Amino acid sequence: MNALRLGSYTFSSRLILGTGKFSSVSAMIEAVRASGSQLVTVALRRFNREQAEDDLFGPLSEIEGLTLMPNTSGAATAKEAVKAAHISRELSGSPFIKVEIHPNPHHLMPDPIETYEACKILAAEEFIVMPYIPADPVLAKRLEEVGCSSVMPLGSAIGSGQGLSTSAMVQLIIRESSIPVIVDAGLRSPSEACAAMEMGCEAVLVNSAIAVARDPAAMAGAFARAVEAGYDARNAGLMQRSGSAVATSPLTSFLGAGS
């Protein structure tokens, strides 16, 4: 695969991992290693060096070639997200920030207005801004215009496992974007990650589907292979769909050709 470029960084893996929901830190670390991911997202509250059982920064920092992308999960307003981003950059040293603002705990849908306001500020402060957004082509374009390095439309609701229910809108975003489009949230299976790559996404972010699997490390490896397969298939050139059968062999008579 060609390298994924985000800001001034390049990554050979196009699978981004979330680090929540795992049964233990060791299970999460095993999954990250098995995935080959070079970019993982971590909630601010998991930067806790004083309590080793809650701290992910230390263990993740030991993985060579891994870049941390703090996120603002828990923020309900642009102001809270900007504050979380500042603290995260100070603690991690990472220029990346995944902007997540979902004030309603019942559906966890991203707030488009607060997200836009936070991204304007953070992009001006030279963060590598990667916002989690509804699958809204107009919002995606506005975020590109203010300097976001990518947009991350949801495939479906966080943790729902409902797959690519927004695929039609995601395809519109891809068509109109000149920055990477990364599907985030709702993916349940490697086949759905493959489909996202085939439709034109530059990467996918997966958390729950790996974290709650019976064998998270094995599932992480399966997602990694699916992402690579989808990317390669897209670049190889997928055949066009047809409304009717198209013969693969000549239909002319041949049985009586020698008589």
UniProtKB/Swiss-Prot annotation:
Molecular function in Gene Ontology: thiazole synthase activity
The enzyme's E.C. designation: 2.8.1.10
Annotated localization: Cytoplasm
Keyword Transferase: yes
SUPFAM superfamilies in the record: ThiG-like (SSF110399)
Binding residues annotated for 1-deoxy-D-xylulose 5-phosphate, in chain numbering: 159, 185-186, 207-208
Catalytic activity annotation: [ThiS sulfur-carrier protein]-C-terminal-Gly-aminoethanethioate + 2-iminoacetate + 1-deoxy-D-xylulose 5-phosphate = [ThiS sulfur-carrier protein]-C-terminal Gly-Gly + 2-[(2R,5Z)-2-carboxy-4-methylthiazol-5(2H)-ylidene]ethyl phosphate + 2 H2O + H(+)
Metabolic or biological pathway, per its Swiss-Prot or TrEMBL entry: Cofactor biosynthesis; thiamine diphosphate biosynthesis
Chief location: cytoplasm
Location of the active site: 98 (schiff-base intermediate with dxp)
Gene Ontology cellular component annotations, sorted alphabetically: cytoplasm
Keywords: Cytoplasm, Schiff base, Thiamine biosynthesis, Transferase
GO terms (BP aspect): thiamine diphosphate biosynthetic process
Family classification: Belongs to the ThiG family.
Role summary: Catalyzes the rearrangement of 1-deoxy-D-xylulose 5-phosphate (DXP) to produce the thiazole phosphate moiety of thiamine. Sulfur is provided by the thiocarboxylate moiety of the carrier protein ThiS. In vitro, sulfur can be provided by H(2)S.
Subunit organization: Homotetramer. Forms heterodimers with either ThiH or ThiS.
Protein name stated in the entry: Thiazole synthase
Gene name as annotated: thiG
